[in-house]
Structures are given as structure tokens and as C-alpha cells.
Amino acid sequence: MSSLRDQLAQVAQNNATVALDRKRRQKLHSASLVYNPKTAATQDYEYIYDTALESFHTLVSLDLRFKVFTNSLFSASSVTIDRNVQTKDQIRDLDNAVNAYLMLISPKWHLTPALHATEWLIRRFQIHIHNAEMLLLSTLNQYQTPVFKRILNIVKLPPLFNPFTNFVRNDKNPTDLTLIKLFNDMDFLKLYSNYLSKIIKQKVTYTNQLLFTTCCFINVIAFNANDEDKLNKLVPLILEISAKLLASDSSDCQMAAHTMLAVLATALPLNKSIIIAATETILANLKEDDARKKALVTISKLFQTLKGVGNVDQLPVKIYKLVDNSFPFEYLLQFLSNENKYSSDKFFTAYIRSVIRYDHDKLSQIVKILRKIKLEKYEVRFIITDLIHLSEVLEDKSQLIDVFEYFISINEGLVLKCLQALNLTGEVFEIRLTTSLFSVKNSAEQSGEDIIKVLDDAKASTANGSAVPFKDFMTKNSEFISTKAESMLLVKDEKFVKLLSLFVEAVSKGYQPGLFLSSFFTTLESRITFVLRIIVSPGSPVALRLISLTQLSKFINGIDEQTDLFSLVPILVTALMDISRSVRSNTKKVLQQIAKRPFTAKYFLSNVLYGENLKVPMLSPKDSKFWLTNFLSDYIVESTDISSLVIPSKNDMVYMLFWCNQALHLPLAYSKTIMLKLLTAVPQYAFTYSKVFEQFMATYITERSSWETKCIKNKTNFKDFETAVCAIVAPKEKNSFAIDFLINCLESEYEQLSNIMADRILSLYPTLKFPNQLKIVQSIIDSSVDKELSYDGLETLQSLPLTADIFVSVLKSNTINSEDQTDLTKRRRRRSSTVNKSALQKQDISQIAEAHLKKMTIILETLDKLKVKSNENLLNALFNLLSDLETLDHDGGLPVLYAQETLSSCLLNTISSLKSNNGSMKLPSIRADILVAAIRSSTSPQMQNKLLLVVGALASVSPETILHSVMPIFTFMGAHTIRQDDEFSTLVVERTISTIVPALLKSTEVTNKSDEIEFLLMSFSTAFSHVPKHRRVSLYSTLVRELGPSDVIAPFLFLIAQQYSNCLEKFKIAESKNYIEFFKAFLSKFDILEQLHGFNELFNLVELLDEDSSKNEVAPTRTLFSNGIVNMSKSELFVLKKNDLDFIDKVIGESKSDYYNTSSNLKLRILSTLLDPNIEIEVKNQVRNEFSILLSKTLNAINMTDSLSYDKHSSAGSNDEEAGSESEAEVDQKELKDILFGLLEHVLDLLPIQDFVASILPLLQGNTDESVRHHLTVVTSNKFIEEPMESFETANEILSTLVETTEKASESTQILQVTLNTISSIVTRFGDRLDSHLLVKSMENSCKQLTSKKIELEISSLTVLTTLIQTLGVKTLAFYPKIVPVAISIFKTYQNAKNNLKEQLQLAIVLLFASMIKKIPSFLLSNLQDVFVILFHSDEVADSVRLSVISLIVEHIPLKDVFKTLQKVWTNDVSSSNNSVAVSLFLSMLESAVEAIDKKSATQQSPVFFRLLLNLFEYRSICTFDENSINRIEASVHQIANVYVLKLNDKVFRPLFALVVNWAFNGEGVTNTNMSKEERLMAFYKFYNKTQENLKSIITSYFTYLLEPTNNLLKQFISKETVNVSLRRLVLISLTSSFKYDRDEYWKSTSRFELISESLINQLTNVEDVIGKYLVKAIGSLATNNSGVDEHNKIMSDLMISHMKTSCKTREKFWAVRSMKLIYSKVGDGWLVLLPRLVPIIAELLEDEDEEVEYEVRSGLVKVVESVMGEPFDRYLS
């Protein structure tokens, strides 16, 4: 029975749509899927129904299944149906109809009619409330659409859909994580499973819904991947859902189930029974082809998850039949071919084992599966073991042969191990399967033992089974009995194979071999030839071959002595190559047996052995005997190569002919293979013997198929056979039929034959004569073009050792232009003609031309690959071919680009080979104009590059050949090639330059070489901006290096600077920087002399731009000035010059990038040259000379600047315009001067310091321009900053000059300032290493400048004095009066003034005093107060700097003087300044001094410190800061005072403390009379409280000094004479801490206790609420301190009770109760005896009128008392 809650919930659900009031009805009616609530509220049911009915009819037209709802949900009567008044049955029917409709509408929510139709159900039947679950389930897969969001806004969420709560009436759609949370609920999964069952049953599933379901379940599995328990709970549910989906006829449902099962099995491996059941379910209803593949993949994945024992056992028979019916064998093969990405070995192992167990008809086909799948080793072992067991019972064992051959081919050892595990051997198993299988044999085995084993096994098997009498066996197979005296070597393979199988079967059944042979072969000839064929048959088991040898030996004994058995020897010799040692050993015995017989001319079966009436030439008996005897004596069983024994060196021609004939006529493929291998392996084999095989070679290709069939049937390796056949073609072959055979094999349609012969050619080709070589090469080329070859003709061709003559011959035979290109009279290039074009348009000729192009391509590829040793004829032929390709390109329009590129490579290789062999040579027959024309006409940059390389290579071999084409080539390169951004193009240009330019320079035919060079530079520099940025340095450095750096750097620099100028004028700043970066990197490729020389020559070129120089005839005539410079105006020339100099300046100067790239740092290069001891002195002098020239040219340019003038405008302007023009000229000249000064600075910075000083001293000492001297002085300062200390002598030289400058009265302020700054920099760097006389002189001059009244000079002088004091120390004492007073005066002068240099001045003064403090501290004491004042008031100086100076003061100045000075400074300056920073710095200094002072000094200076301390206490009354700032200052003072007190002993501190008490209470020693007593008391008590916290019980007794005053103060608080809450709080805190830290029973003294207790407790009468808690703590602490003294307890109790009486004030009683509660909570046991007196008081208070008092007593005091007594307090009240 359901609970009451459930019943109520059901009632609420049923009445959810019952609305008794209008507002609720309106709200229910306004819930709409389409309209907003306001619109929906105004609509009636008729309107809604009409709209919905129209949409419903649209749905019916789309899907007729909706028609069923015509008479129910969408009937006309539905308008009047009210769900709330329906019966249960009617409601049930309505719900069923709605649910059916929702399941059917699910895939159509994206359609507008679906929304409008469903709108009716929502508005009329409230399905969003009563059918909410089905509505949500049917739309769940639409969770990311607006429709679902609308549904969430109106639906009443069922409990299981709680994860959607946050998305109700929200703009956001549910997330994927929300769906995972939803599906992670087991109850919801069950609900969804039921829903799936319904839609599957109703057949209303659809793809998107199934895809959504699948994804959700996969996400849930993935979400719980690490929770095995949860996965185990999911398994039954997912299996149930999968079963329902699989039961559906829909392929989509089935594939959804497949996916879920596969994912589940991957996440949680299932046991085998579940997987078998799942497999059965999957296969039970598998009908659609779409689902079949997915089903197989799923089954494979399920099986792949199996682990442990039995995971690859055969399938149950029922499952196997289902698999076989669902997946035909061919389907499985196709699946394995296409789906290699899936691991399915376990399923297919189980399937194969099932085939072995149940379905033997498919045994022969399982090899196809095995070849397509990779199995684990253990799986292979299971299958092999099953097959071995099957071989015992299977009738037709031939079905197993292919399978075992496959397993043996991949792992023969494993098969043998499986046999051994079952007590079987390989030989026995071969007998069982009636075939030869194994190739790996034990070398120690013996034939006798093998035979015994075979016979024993056969007998055992016969005994176990029902033995068939031999007579019956013979009768059954009587059709195969041979009665003719025939050679069994000639019998058809089918018959032989059958006889072989019968022989094996007979042996395996235990029949005697002799009985079988004598019964089935009635003649001796047939018996012997049969066993002979078995011996050399690869398909016969080893045991059978041994038996056959034994039988042959017996048969030989039965032949008469007159018959010569040497005719059997050739076949037996081939048996000596058997893999089995036992076979070889027994064969040797048979040969020995034959050797013992007489040799006669009567050969056994001489005319019928190899064919009817086929007479094979034989050896004479004598030769036969000789050969066999020697052979057996030399043969060893272990031998693997017996070719030298077969063809002995003596009488080798006879034996070669004999064995060649034997090889020719042998009908057995295996024996023929062995014999041919033996013959072709001996060195005697030559073309004379290959004639024997002429007919065989002529017919082989046509008969190849029959030979292949023979090999297959006899298990002979056909590839080995064909290799032996191809080897018939002998080295040094001369026979044309053999060459034809070779060519025919290459051109045959058989891939194996072609490849074998192609490999054979590689070894034969070098031994052939030239005509045959040419014939083979030409045939390969022709066949490669004419037909599709079975081998790689091009690879074969490229593998042959072809010579240049071969290529020349081939090229000549394949040429188009017949005219002689080498004829010197025909210098003009052939032009493409209309005749050629029209001819090549014809189809047949066009095809010929295409074939010709293909041939040429093959030839060129081969030549390019081989790189043969070349000659001039080959080069001529290649040039002719270049002309041919142009013809095909221009006239025929054929795609010759690849051929041209390959030809270019061939030309390069050929020229390189000629150069390495012959060096320089003349090639008059070569046409360079062909190359130039090809370069120009080609549209391919790569082709152009390669041809340029050819030009360069040709120039290195024969310069005259290309000399006349130099300019066109370079013009083309400048316009095209150097613009390509690839490594190859760059390499081409560099190589072309490096080859052609030297030829140009060496040539005697070229005049005006400088013009040519400048034209060349202009061609390349014009294309600079188009050259890829990272290619420029390499390209242009190569060009300049080849042209000659000493002559070319300057013109090239000039051209680049001109482009730099153009960029600046066009405001392309970023691009202009690229030129500077480029040229720095460019110059790094040359040595320093070349760089300096280039700069000097560039100055010469720049000078030509001046106005006067422009009239010079040199400038216009130079090629360098032809690109627009000659036509420039004067103003344009001036701008160009200015920008050129700026370019030089930036190239020479250092930048940030030079820090990381030392190679482009000019300064570093000069230094390394001058300082390197390995460089010769002469070179260093040359560097200095070049630098001198550079410096002189720079200075000359500066001197010439003033004389420059130009007119920007026409002279016909007004005076105003002229004035403006002159102003612009002055600005430009100033800019030019600045550039030149910067250049001068950078030039001077290039040299080492010694050379630098030597260069500038004359300039500084002479009458040089002031601006020049100014810049030189600044450069000097910077120069010395990074110099090592060893340069002090050089520094003395420059310092002397600078000191002299400061002495000159005529010098300007600017010069004096920069000079003083430089002196300071030098002194700072070198210190006392400098000449002391110069330093003193500098001091004197600085003191003079200190009084100059010019702030710039004052700052610089102070800086110099600071460094000098730092350096000289005490030696500067004589200048003290000239420095310190003046500095103090200067500070005061500018202290309140506004000046931009004020900060620098204050900093300079502070640093001056800092250096004095450090170096001469004792002499500064007289002005220490002034120093402190300056330090505290240098507002412009950073606080960190001033704090550092404070540290110096504390460290170097005696602390007693520091304290005294601090006291004076505070009194006289800081206290009255209202400067918070000054106060902060003062306290910082005081703190540092207190921390640094030792105890002895602290004792001595204690009076001074405490006077200062009292002054600091008084600061409160005079400062204007806010209260927080004052409190922070006092907190710092208290902290400093406590640190100081810790360094004093009691003897010293006690009188000082008394002094402070007198100051506080009596006003003794007060300096500020305006300070009130209360302010003093507050300051004192703060100090005392802080000290009490630090010293604790040490100063408890000190309270004696303030006991009476404190008592009086407490009384004043009671009497309200003093009303100061803060002061009262401080007093109470002081008493509390004193009581708390009393360790010497100080307060247990009755006199003190009685004195203080009354005053303290009486504070209850009027204590302020804000400090009441402090009074409670004080009283509690006093009670705790005196808890052991009963008298004191009684006194306190009486006093406390007196404040708790009813007559007392309310707050008085309240705080008294609080105090009593604290007392009892702390010392309750001691006060228990006093409780009776307290009980009446408590009783009265419990009935107090004030609720707060009554509550405090009841909940506070009473509870504490009860806890102390351990019993209820009520009993005392009763």
C-alpha cells in the first residue's frame, strides 16, 4: 500500500491543471510552445484548434501514420474535451494517444507544422504537465535546439529530469555534461530503456535519435571508465537495451547496439558466456547488408577483449552455423582485405578452429584467411595442433597440404615443435600427408633409422586401424599399373603424382616398398626410372626418397654386368644437391655401386631414358669411368658446390659438351635446374657452349607456360628454374641468337622472366662487345617507349656501366636536325620554320615526335644518373640535342621542360668531367648563343638557373666560348634570376658569377673594364629590393669578391647608399633599416683593410656630389653616375650627400644587433686585427693608415660643411622667400653637422684607447670648433667607461688636457660642463691610479667652478669633487672649507626655488656628503647637523638613496655624535617642519642607530636618548598630522624605545623611568608647555604598556613610581574630574598587564592591594560601556593575582557586592555581575567560602527590573557558580 505522501503527490498531480481562480486559469492557458504568454492568454480554443488542424493535415500528407489521430486528438469534439472531468479509462486512452503521437512526431520537431500541431495538445490537454516525461523523452535528442528550450520553459519537470532545473526559463541550452549527468542516473536509464522499448515496438525509431542514444550511452561508459562497480551495474541495462535494439528489423537499431556493445566490452571486458550470447543475439536477426559489416566488426572487437584460458576455443556449433550463414567465406576474405585497422585475430582463430572441428569442406580455403590476418604465436600453435589431430582421422589428407605448407613457410620450427609435442616427426608427418613439406633437417639423421621409424609408424597405424590387404589395395588402384618397359621420367606429371601418392600410402600402411614397386611396375626399366624420379622429386617425402635409393640399389644388383648404368649418373648427380644429408649420402653409395660395375658401350635405356628414340650424346666408357672415379674420390657429402667436380679441368671441353647435352635433354625441371646451375657456375662455360641451347632458347618463351606447370606440379621453385635458364647466356656472348633471346626475355610479358634477365644483364653487359652493348641499350630504350614493360627498363639502363661512346652513338641515331651544328660556317642559329610547325601538327608525325621526346628523356635521365667520363663528342651531341628540344618546344609545342632540365644537368656533369680530365681547353664547335637563347626563351626559373650554371661551367673550361654573351647573361640575371627565393637560384647566381666574372677580368678582348664592372654593379644593385632578404649577403658578397673588393666595395656602397637615400626621402623608414642591416652583414664577408679602404673611396665619391665638384668632367663620364645623378639639382645632390653620410654613420656605428653578431661589428674586427700578435706589423700599420685617412676625411667633411650652399628655389623669388630659403639651408647644414659629428664619434670609437687618445688630443688642445670639441669630449667619456684599469696611463694623458680646459676662463659653460663630467667619469673609472697632481689640480678647479653661480657647473663640480674625495680621501682635507660650506649654501639657495636641475643638484650634494661620510667622517662632525638637515629635506632625491646614506652615517659616524645631533636636529628643525618624509627618515636613522649601538654606549647615551624620547612624546601636541599618522609615529617611537631599553640594565633604566613618570604626572622637563597633562599621560601609558609587554615581570615593581598617581587618577575618573575614555582604557590595560605579569607577589602586598582595589572596583560606578570589558579584565586579573589571600578575597567580595545591590545603577550592576562571573570562572574554588554572602544578592538580581541584568545573572553568573559548586543553584534559593 502506498504511503500517505505518495497518495497526496498523486492527488496533486491529478489536480495540477485544476484552476479554481481566474489568475491560475489564465496562467495555465498562457503556457504555449509557439506564442508568448501575453498573446497566448488572449487566444480561445477554436482559434488554436483551427491553426493546429491545418498543420496536422500537413503532417498527414508527410506521414500517413498521423491519420490515426484524426478522430481522437484532432477531432472536432476535442475542442470541448476537458481532461479534468474524464473517467480513468478515458484519461488512460488519452494518455496512450498522446504518447503515440509524441513518439511519432519526434523526428519532425524541426518542422513548423509539428510545433503548431503539438501546440493544440499543450493548450487543450496540458501534455506539458500530464505527459511531461514522454514529451521530454521524445524531444531529448533535440536538446541543443530552440524547440527544446521552449519546452523546458513550459514543462513541469519530473523528478528524474532534475539536471535540467538550471536551464528552465534560461537563455542557455543544456550542455553535454548535463546529458551525461542525466544518463548517469540508473533510474533514468531504466525509464529511457522503457521508452526505447516502446519506440522499437512501434517502429518509430530514426537515425538521429539512435545516434543520440548511442552517444549518450558511450559518454556514460566513458564517464565511469574508472568506476568498475558502476560499470558492472550498467552491464545488465546496456545488454538489455542492446538486445531490444538487435531484435528490431531496422539496420540503424542494430548498428546502434553494435556500437554500444563494442564500447562496453572495451571499457569492461565481459566474460565469454556473455560475449557468446551477445554474438548469438547479433547474428539472430541480421538481415540488412548495411548492418552486416558493422556486426562483424563488433563481434571481432568483442572476441578481442577476451582474456585468459579458452579465449580462442572453437565456437559452439550453433554459433558457428550462425556465423557461416551470416558471413559467407568470400565475405570474410573481403572484410580482412579492407579492414586492416581492426585487430580481429581472436575471432578468426576461433572461427578457423571451428572450421577444423565442424566444416572440413572449407579446410582448403582457410589458407586464404591465414594469409590476410596476423595471428599471435599461441593462436598459430592451437590451429596447427588442431590440424595435426585432424590429420589422423581425415580421409582426404590432401586438403591439409596447402595449410601446412603455409605454416611451414612462415614458421617451420613451430610446426616441428607441435609435431614433437605429439610424439611425431617431420618424416612421419610427410608420409601421412603423402608429400614433402620440411626443408630444415637434422644433419645427424641416418637413412636406416628414418626407414625404421617410418615402417614402425606405419605398422602401428595399421594395427590401430582396419588393415586393408595389399591385394585389395592393388585391385582398387589397378588402373595405374605400368606394364611397359618405359622411362617413367617421361610420364605425365599427373600420373606420376598419383603413383607417388599411392607409393606413400602403401608405405604408410605398412606394405613392403618392393612389393608395391614390383606389383605396379612390371618391368625393371619402369621400376628403376620411377624410383629415380622419386629420388630427384622435391614433392616426395625424404623418407620415401631414402626408400627409393634403397630400392634402386637393389634393382642395380639385378641388372646384368654388361649394361652400363652411367646413363643414370646425371640424374643421380642432381640428387647430390638434396637438402637432406641422408639422401646425399645414400646417393653417393649408389654412385659408388655404379662405379664398381664395368663401363661398356651398352648404356641402360640410352635411347629412351629422356625420350622415345632420343639419342643423347654420351661419354666413352673410358671417360665415363675416369670422370666417375675422380668425382667420387673428391666428393664430400657436406659439399654445397660441386660444379668444379662436375667439370674437371682436364679434358673439360668433352665434359662440358656432355653435360650441356644432358642439361638440354633432361625432361625433369628440378634436375634441369640443378644441371644448368652447375654448368653456368664454372668458369669454362662460354658462348661456344651456349650454342648447344640455341633451339631451347628459341622456343623457351613460347613453352614457358608448360615448364611453369611442370615446376608447380613437381614442387620445383620456378623462379630458380628460370634463373638457371637465363644464366645460359654466357659472359662475352657473341651469338646473335643469345643476344636476341636476352632481348626477347626483357621484352616478354612475364614479369619474373624480365626481372631475372634484367639482373643477368648487369653482370653480362661489361663482358660484351660494343655492337652488342649498343644493341641491348637501344632495344631497352625503344621498348621502354613502344610498349609497357614487365620490368623497370630505366632502372636497368641506369644500372649498366654505359660509356660516353654509347651515349654518343645513341644520341646520333636519335637526332632530328640533320644540319651539322659543328660547322663553323653556320654560326646563325636555326629559326623555327612554318614548314616544321605544319609538319609537327600532323598526327602521325606528332606521335613520332612524342616517342622521340620520351626516348631522349630516358637517355638523358640515364646519362644524368651515371655521370660518365665525358669527351668533346658527347658535349657536341648534347648541344645538338638542346637544339632538337627547342624545335620540339617551339614548333611542336611538346612538354620539353623536364627533358631540358635533365639535359642541363647532363651538360653540367659533362663539362665538369671534361674540366677534371683536361682542365682549360678550346671548344670552337660549341654554340654559346644556343644557351643564351634557351635561357631567354624559357619560362621556367629552374630551367633558367640550370642553363646559367651551364654557362658558368662552360666559362670555367673555355672562357672564349661565352665571352661575347656576357652582358646579355648578366642583364637577364639582374632582371630575373636573383629575384627568386630559393636555394637553387642563389647557388646558380653565385656559381655563375664566380665562373664568368674571372673570365671577364682575365679576358684581353674586353676594353674599359671599369665601365663593364660598374654597369654590372648597377644591374645587380637595381634589383636589390627584389632579392629575397636572406639571400642578399651571399649573392652580393660573391659578386664583389669576384670583381675585386678593393675597387668595387666603394661603388657598390655608393649605389646602396643611393637607394637608402631614396627610401628616406619617401619615408620608408623600415625599408631603409634593411639596407643598413644588409651592408653590415655584407662587410663582414671582407677583411678589415678592404672595409676601411671601401669607406675612404666612398668619401671620394661623395665629394664628387659637391657643387664645385659637379663641374668636374670626371663625374658625368662615369657609368656609376649615369642613373640620374648627373641630372640632379643642387638641393637633391645635397640631400643625397647628407643621406649617404648618414648611411656611412649607421654602418660604422654599433647597434643592439651587433652585440649578438660579432662578425658584423667593425670595431671588434679592428681591435682583433690590432691586438692579434699573429698578424704582421705591416698589416697593423696599414689598418692605422687607412683609419687616419678615414678620420681626416671625416674631419675635412666637417670643416667643409659651413662652405656648402645651395638654392632650393628659383633666384627670381622675393626677399621673404630668400630669407626662408636661407633658414632651411641653415637647418639642413645643422642636420649635416649632427650626422658628421655622430660619424666622427663612431669613427673615433673604432680604435683602441691608445690610438683613440692620440687621435683626439690634437683636436681637444687646438683651436677646434666648439661643437667638435664638445662631441669629442662626450665620446671620450663614453670611451673610457669600459676600458680596463691598465689604461690609466692613457687616461692621465687625456685628463691633463681636460684639466687645462677647466682652467681657461674663456671656455663656455657647455664645454666646461661636459669637461667636468668627463673628468668625473675618468676618475670614477681609474681612481687612485691616476696622477695625484692632476687629481689635486682637478679639485682646485672644481672648487672654483663651485662658486660660479651656474647650476650646471655647480652640479658637475660637485660630481667631480665627490669622485675625487672617494679617490683621495684624507688628502682632500685642505679643500674642506671650500667645499662643505659652499655646498650647504648652494642647497639652501635652491631649496625653495623652482629649477629643472634641482633634483640633480640635491642628489649631487647628498652624494658629496655620502663620500665624505665614508672617507673623512671625523672631519664632517662639525657640520653633521647641517648634513642631517640636508639629508632629511632633499625632497627631490629618492628615498632609497637617502636611506643608503643613513646606513653610511650609522656605520661610519660615532653613534654618540649621531644621538646628540639627532636630538638637536629634532628640536631645531624636524619637529617644526611638518614634513612627514623628514620625520620618517629621522625615525629610520634613530632606529638604525639604536639597533647599532652597543650596551655600554647605550648606557652612556641614555640621558640624551630619553630627552629625545620625551621630545618625541611631546610631538603629538605640535604636529599637524592626522590621528592615524601620529599613532604610527608614536608606535615607531615606542618600538625604538623598547629596543633601546633592552640594552640598559635596571640600575640605569629605573631612574630614567622615574624621570619619564615625573614628566608625565608632574610635568617635569616638559619643553612644550602647550601639551596638556592628559596628552602626557596617554603618551606615558602607551609607552608603559608597550614596555610591559616586552619586559613582562621585570618591570612589575616599577609600578611603585606610578602607584599613587595612578590611584589618584582612578579616583578622578570616579569623581569625573577627569573624563577621557582613551586615557581610562590605557590605565586599565596597564593595571591588567601589571597584575598579569606579577611574578614576585608585588600586588599581594596588603597596602598596595587595599590602595588599588578600592579605586579599581569603584570604577564600576561610572565606567563607560565601550571600555567596560577592560575594567572586567582588570578586576579579574587582580582577583586572580590575590586568589591565595583570603583577606583580600573578602575585601574584594565586599566591594563587589556593594556594587550589585538593588539600589545601584543598572550599568553598575551589569558590569559588577560580569566582573563577578569572570572572578568565579577563574578562581571559583577560592571564593566558594564567600558564596553565602553572594546568594541573597544573586536572588535579588534574578528579579531585577532590568532584563539585561537579570539575563546576565541567570545565564552568566549562575551558570558559572553552578559549574564551580557542581550542583544546581536553585537549592540555595529555596
UniProtKB/Swiss-Prot annotation:
Biological process terms in GO annotation: maturation of SSU-rRNA from tricistronic rRNA transcript (SSU-rRNA, 5.8S rRNA, LSU-rRNA); positive regulation of transcription by RNA polymerase I
Subcellular location as annotated: Nucleus, Nucleolus
Gene Ontology CC annotations of this record: 90S preribosome; small-subunit processome; t-UTP complex
Biased composition (Acidic residues): 1215-1226
SUPFAM superfamilies linked to this entry: ARM repeat (SSF48371)
Molecular function via GO: snoRNA binding
Keyword check for Cytoplasm: no
HEAT repeat start and end residues: 1734-1772
Claim: Ribonucleoprotein is one of the keywords in the record: yes
Chief location bin: nucleus
Residue span of region Disordered: 1206-1226
Protein function: Involved in nucleolar processing of pre-18S ribosomal RNA. Involved in ribosome biosynthesis.
Record family assignment: Belongs to the HEATR1/UTP10 family.
Subunit structure: Component of the ribosomal small subunit (SSU) processome.
Protein name, UniProt field: U3 small nucleolar RNA-associated protein 10
Organism, as annotated: Kluyveromyces lactis (strain ATCC 8585 / CBS 2359 / DSM 70799 / NBRC 1267 / NRRL Y-1140 / WM37)
Name of encoding gene: UTP10
